[in-house]
Amino acid sequence: MLGGGVGDSYQPIEKKYQLTRRALQLVHEFGFPVHVLTKSVLVIRDADILNAVNQHSRAIVSFSFSSVDDRTSAVVEPRVPSPSERLDAIRFFKSQGIACGMFLLPVIPGVTDSPELLEEAVAKASGAGVDFIIFSGMTLKEGRQKDYFIGAVRDHYPRLAADYRRIYGGSKWGEPVPEYSDSLNRTFGAIVRRYKVPIRMPPALYRDVLGENDLVVVILEQIDYLLRMQGQRSPFGRAAYSISQIPEPLSGLKGGLRDLWGVGETAERVVLEVLETGKSSYHQQLLAGQGIRPEARL
């Protein structure tokens, strides 16, 4: 992964120093796959290297959005390329044969979380040809960032102050109250099913570039997410975390999987199937419930 949730590899200074471009060149030279996450359309500059990576391994380019509305974005995402520019960049990379994702996060309560704006985002992403959408609401942990954000809310959306006190009332980690999160997830889930856009990266984009441990962890995490998006409880997240901490190949531990924290009978069955076949029928069943053909490279 080149990029992240709290920093962008394509800062304006990248135009001058080209550190990210040089990092991509190393990725190419060593034969690694790469997934770029950014808000910047400067990534188009590096299409030559990304195409080269995609020839020998896999290159994926994702853009993050809080909204696809240019006017709203100018307030909540100042000093970054507009959503329209980012959607055009997705179209460009898709025309090059490079898979693309939308990271629709954080969705901001009272600002970008209405059903209308969520549907606009999914519709425009689908129209641009995205291969998947990663979705999340917003956390608001106590500290400087929360103080800054609440100040911006007072300046631009003063009517929302009481809503934020209700939604972010008491969580140590800044998580919204469950009734808000559950409602938001149900709304988004209903919309994205209509457009048949995957809400996690499709297996065809990662199965052939991951080792066995990582493949198991990714599938378990996706199962966990898909179940929680349906409002169900899930043990698969704990199993995924436990397995992610194991340095040795998982295939050598087949007889002792149940000794791992969080791995019960159901998770063990999934793990053994993935080790045997490279896929999980339960995972595929959940993906099919989203209207997605798991084996298709979208």
Indicate where each model-derived feature is located.
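Acidic-histidine catalytic/liganding microenvironments
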Residues: 56, 195, 260
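Long, highly charged, low-complexity intrinsically disordered interaction regions
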Residues: 201-298
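General structural signal for secondary-structure boundaries
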Residues: 36, 82, 173-177, 181, ...
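Hydrophobic, helix-prone linear segments
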Residues: 36, 93-96, 190, 195, ...
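Conserved AdoMet/S-adenosylmethionine-binding subsite of the radical SAM
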Residues: 1-164, 173
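Auxiliary Fe-S-binding modules of radical SAM enzymes
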Residues: 116-238
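Residue-level marker of positions within ordered structural domains that often coincide
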Residues: 8, 193, 241
